[in-house]
C-alpha cells in the first residue's frame, strides 16, 4: 500500500498505528460522557487517534479523535504535512476556474493536474464490505450502535461524523454533507442541516418537484479518509465530493448502489444508514453542546427514518465531539485554512496570507494580509472574503493588515490594529447579514451584523496626516553586534534568550 493513499478507513488506521498515531483502548469506557472526556484531554495534548475496543454496553468499537491533529488531517488528504495542503488548494483553485494552457510549456506544467482529473469519475462495485450485513424493517435498531452522548445537558445521543448523501431532482451529481443527527427512536434521527447547505437545498428542490413524496437519504459512517475530508473541503459547486476524493486519493472513489434507493455510498464504509425524510415530518432538535463552547437553542429539523442498516461484519463506529476550541472541527479548520489560501489568492492575487484562528470557532474571525495597492483596498478585500466562498458567509469579523504583519501572530495583528486604525474611519459595519443560527449573540436567529477592521497603513485619500514610518534597525550595527554577541556574555550560556 502506498503510504499516503488509502483504500479504506482501515488502511489509514493501520498506517496511523505503525506511526504511533493510534492508541487502542481496551479498558471498558462508557459512550455516555466518558469517551468525550478522554478524547478531549487527548486532543488538547496533541495525542493520537483513539480506538475504544470495549465501549460499555456495546460490541462495536468506537473510533474518536481521528483528525485530532493537523498532521493527521494532512495524512488523510494524502500529504506528508500541513504545508503541503497548499497544493490541494491550488488544485481546487484550478478546478474552480480552469484556464486553458497558454503554450506547450504551460501545458507540460499543468499535465499533472489534467492527469489527476482522470480520477474524478466514481467506480461502481458490487459485493462490497459495507453490505456484508444487512438489517431492515423492524430489525433496524440504532440503539445497537454506540452513539455517543457528549455533554451533560445534551438532549440525546448524537451521530456526529455521518456523511449524508442526497441528490436533488434536477442534478446529476450527489451531494455529501456532514450534519449532526439526534437519536429519537430505534429507527429515527433528526437531520440538522442549515438551509444553505447542500443536503437542505436538495431536499427543498425535491419537495417543490415531488410534493408529498418521500426524499431518499443515505448516511455513511466510517468512510475512507479522502471521502470524509472531501465532504468538509470547499469544493466548487459543480464538483462532486466523490470526484474530489478521487483527486485526493489518486484513484477513483469506489461506490455501491444502496439497497433501498438509487443513491451511491462509499463501498468501503463501515456502516450505512438508508431511509427517507417524510415531507413535513419535523422534530425539535437539541440542545447540544456545540463548537462555540455553549449549548445551542432548540429548533425544528426534518426527521430521517432509517429503513435499512448495512455494515461490515466487524464494523467500527466513527464519532467525535464538538465543544469550545480546540476540538476536532477546530483542528480541521487549522488544516483546511491552508487549502483556502490559494483559492482566495486566485481571485484576489494581492492576498499574502489568510488565517482563521481556531479560538474564533474556526470561521467567525479572519485575518487577511495584503499587498495594498490603493486607497480603500482593504474594504474591497473584506467584501471579497464575505462573498467569494460560502464558507465565509458566517464570518463575523474580518481584519485586514499589510504584508509586513504576520496574520498568524496576535502580537503583530494587535500592534497593527492599535497603531494603524482609527475606530470611526477604519471600521466597517454591515447589518442584516446571514449569521450562523447557533450564534445566540445575534439579535435575530440567522441574521446579524459583520465588522471589518482596516488595520492597514493609510494612503493619500484615507488620511490627511503624515503617516508614521516604522522603526528599522541599522543592518550594519546588527551585523556588528551579532559578531561580538558571545563575547558580551550577557546570558550565562553566552547565547541569546
From Swiss-Prot:
Q: Which reaction does it catalyse?
A: a 4-hydroxy-3-(all-trans-polyprenyl)benzoate + H(+) = a 2-(all-trans-polyprenyl)phenol + CO2
Keyword annotations of the record: Cell membrane, Decarboxylase, Flavoprotein, FMN, Lyase, Manganese, Membrane, Metal-binding, Ubiquinone biosynthesis
Give the enzyme class: lyase
Q: How is the cofactor bound?
A: Binds 1 prenylated FMN per subunit.
Q: A GO biological process this protein is involved in?
A: ubiquinone biosynthetic process
Q: Where in the cell is it found?
A: Cell membrane
Q: Look up the record and report any one GO term of the cellular component aspect.
A: plasma membrane
Where does the record place the catalytic residues?
290
Entry superkingdom: Bacteria
Q: Does the keyword Lyase apply?
A: yes
Which of this chain's residues are annotated to bind Mn(2+)? 175, 241
Q: Keyword Ubl conjugation on this protein? A: no
Which Pfam families would you find in this protein's record?
Answer: UbiD, UbiD_C, UbiD_N
Name its pathway: Cofactor biosynthesis; ubiquinone biosynthesis
HAMAP family the UniProt entry points to: UbiD
Q: How does it assemble?
A: Homohexamer.
Which family does the record claim for this protein? Belongs to the UbiD family.
NCBIfam families xref list: PRK10922.1, UbiD family decarboxylase
Name of this chain's protein: 3-octaprenyl-4-hydroxybenzoate carboxy-lyase
Q: Which organism is it from?
A: Shigella boydii serotype 4 (strain Sb227)
Lineage of the species this protein comes from: Bacteria, Pseudomonadati, Pseudomonadota, Gammaproteobacteria, Enterobacterales
Amino acid at each position: 500500500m502506498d503510504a499516503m493513499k488509502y483504500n479504506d478507513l482501515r488502511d489509514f488506521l493501520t498506517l496511523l498505528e505503525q506511526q504511533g498515531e493510534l492508541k487502542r483502548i481496551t479498558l471498558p469506557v462508557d459512550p455516555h460522557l466518558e469517551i468525550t472526556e478522554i478524547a478531549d484531554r487527548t486532543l488538547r495534548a496533541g495525542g493520537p487517534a483513539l480506538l475504544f475496543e470495549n465501549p460499555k454496553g456495546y460490541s462495536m468499537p468506537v473510533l474518536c479523535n481521528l483528525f485530532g491533529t493537523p498532521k493527521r488531517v494532512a495524512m488523510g488528504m494524502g500529504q506528508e504535512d500541513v504545508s503541503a495542503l497548499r497544493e490541494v488548494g491550488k488544485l481546487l483553485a484550478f478546478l474552480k476556474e480552469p484556464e486553458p494552457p497558454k503554450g506547450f510549456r504551460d501545458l507540460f506544467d499543468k499535465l499533472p493536474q489534467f492527469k489527476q482529473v482522470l480520477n474524478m469519475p466514481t467506480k461502481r462495485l458490487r459485493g462490497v464490505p459495507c453490505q456484508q450485513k444487512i438489517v431492515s424493517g423492524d430489525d433496524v435498531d440504532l440503539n445497537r450502535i454506540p452513539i455517543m452522548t457528549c455533554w451533560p445537558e445534551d438532549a440525546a445521543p448524537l451521530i456526529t461524523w455521518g456523511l449524508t448523501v442526497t441528490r436533488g431532482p434536477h442534478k446529476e451529481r450527489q451531494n455529501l454533507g456532514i450534519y449532526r443527527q439526534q437519536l429519537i427512536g430505534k429507527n429515527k434521527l433528526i437531520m440538522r442541516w442549515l438551509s444553505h447547505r447542500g443536503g437542505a437545498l436538495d431536499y427543498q428542490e425535491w419537495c417543490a418537484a415531488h410534493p408529498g413524496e418521500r426524499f431518499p437519504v443515505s448516511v455513511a459512517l466510517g468512510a475512507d479518509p479522502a471521502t470524509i475530508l472531501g465532504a468538509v473541503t470547499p469544493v466548487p459547486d459543480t464538483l462532486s465530493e466523490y470526484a474530489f476524493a478521487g483527486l485526493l486519493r489518486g484513484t477513483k472513489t469506489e461506490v455501491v448502489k444502496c439497497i433501498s434507493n438509487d443513491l451511491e455510498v462509499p463501498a468501503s464504509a463501515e456502516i450505512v444508514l438508508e431511509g427517507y425524510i417524510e415531507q413535513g415530518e419535523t422534530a425539535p432538535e437539541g440542545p447540544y453542546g456545540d463548537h462555540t463552547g455553549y449549548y445551542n437553542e432548540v429548533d425544528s429539523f426534518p426527521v430521517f427514518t432509517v429503513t435499512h442498516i448495512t455494515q461490515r461484519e466487524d464494523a467500527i463506529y466513527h464519532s467525535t465531539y464538538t465543544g469550545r476550541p480546540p476540538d476536532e472541527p477546530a483542528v480541521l479548520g487549522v488544516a483546511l485554512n491552508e487549502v483556502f489560501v490559494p483559492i482566495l489568492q486566485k481571485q484576489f492575487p494581492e492576498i499574502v496570507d489568510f488565517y482563521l484562528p481556531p479560538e474564533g470557532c474556526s470561521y467567525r474571525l479572519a485575518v487577511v494580509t495584503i499587498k495594498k495597492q490603493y486607497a480603500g483596498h482593504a474594504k474591497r478585500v473584506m467584501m471579497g472574503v464575505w462573498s467569494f466562498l460560502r464558507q465565509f458567509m458566517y464570518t463575523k469579523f474580518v481584519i485586514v493588515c499589510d504584508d509586513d504583519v504576520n496574520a498568524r501572530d496576535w502580537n503583530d495583528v494587535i500592534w497593527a490594529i492599535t497603531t494603524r486604525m482609527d475606530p470611526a474611519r477604519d471600521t466597517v459595519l454591515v447589518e442584516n447579514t446571514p449569521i450562523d443560527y447557533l450564534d445566540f449573540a445575534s439579535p435575530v436567529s440567522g441574521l446579524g451584523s459583520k465588522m471589518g477592521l482596516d488595520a492597514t497603513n493609510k494612503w493619500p485619500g484615507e488620511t490627511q496626516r503624515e503617516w508614521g514610518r516604522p522603526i528599522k534597525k541599522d543592518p550594519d550595527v546588527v551585523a556588528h553586534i551579532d559578531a561580538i554577541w558571545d563575547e558580551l556574555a550577557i546570558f550565562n550560556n553566552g547565547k541569546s534568550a
